[in-house]
């Protein structure tokens, strides 16, 4: 009963917050873009405004989808989120093909299917939350009043995690503003590399969800030896998966780039960065982003947040600006700053993990 009440409070609060953020972005999109990216080409700014305005209308749907997806994962119902995510992506891809290649809508042709797919996914997964056979469901829980005690408990975990993610995304935007000054070839190469990089890290994304669930159970049972064992095992499996994909992407980078219709300069730059990323990701990504999930699962949320914000801003953002505006190194240096950020995170997280403070934190909580 308490879990069901908490589920609705999470959904209600997230939806309200997403609505407020949407209003801010819609009304202040122009100054926000100029603040983040400064002076960029007029065509790029126009396209950015179009994409931002359209996708901002999907923030509420995204909040509903993410909240419900998290609840299904908490019930070990990851198959539900997989199928809903698949539906969302199919709608998005088909919509992009129709709007871009059929209707020639440009940037709007990318943004509109994205927005529609998010609303479809939000509606579907929200309705699935009303199945009474589910351990956590929303049947009989609909109320428009906030439960203060529940919200406090939720925010205790949500605020550090949300602040970390917010600072991370803001840092990425600021880094993008540096990339935007390098011209359209660099912007295109950076975007394509980012897409391929996400493929490279897919095993890590999947295993990270498992780490949170498995370690939470171990910590709840007081079996910290098991928490450490499964952290090592899952991180090892993820690194093997990422390593295999890294080899494939390193060798096939010239072929993959041909699917994106890039110019010669952008294509060559993309191949170079994809290969550098493949090597770095195989060794650095999982310790930097998997180990902190063990700490969070044990209730140690402030330390990962502090390290992530410190490393992101001091190393990735500041170094990116130094490399770009002081040293004039180009796009590759932007990604090198990111890899340095990963190394710093890895050092701090592994040292914390090897100690016992996070275990004591779990016992107190």
Can you name each region flagged by the protein language model?
Residues 54-73, 81-92, 110-125, 204-208, ...:
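Short runs within selected transmembrane alpha-helices of multi-pass transporters and secretion channels
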Residues 29-32, 95, 170-179, 183, ...:
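Hydrophobic/aromatic end-of-helix segments at the C-terminal termini of transmembrane alpha-helices
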Residues 20, 24, 56, 60-61, ...:
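Residue-level hotspots within pore-lining transmembrane alpha-helices
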Residues 54, 65, 88, 117-121, ...:
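Transmembrane helical elements of multi-pass membrane transporters/channels
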Residues 1-23, 62-81, 176, 187-253, ...:
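Small-residue-rich hydrophobic transmembrane alpha-helices
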Residues 1-58, 102-159, 215-281, 324-365:
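Short alpha-helical transmembrane segments in multi-pass integral membrane proteins
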Residues 77-78, 106, 183-184, 263, ...:
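Short loop-to-helix capping motifs
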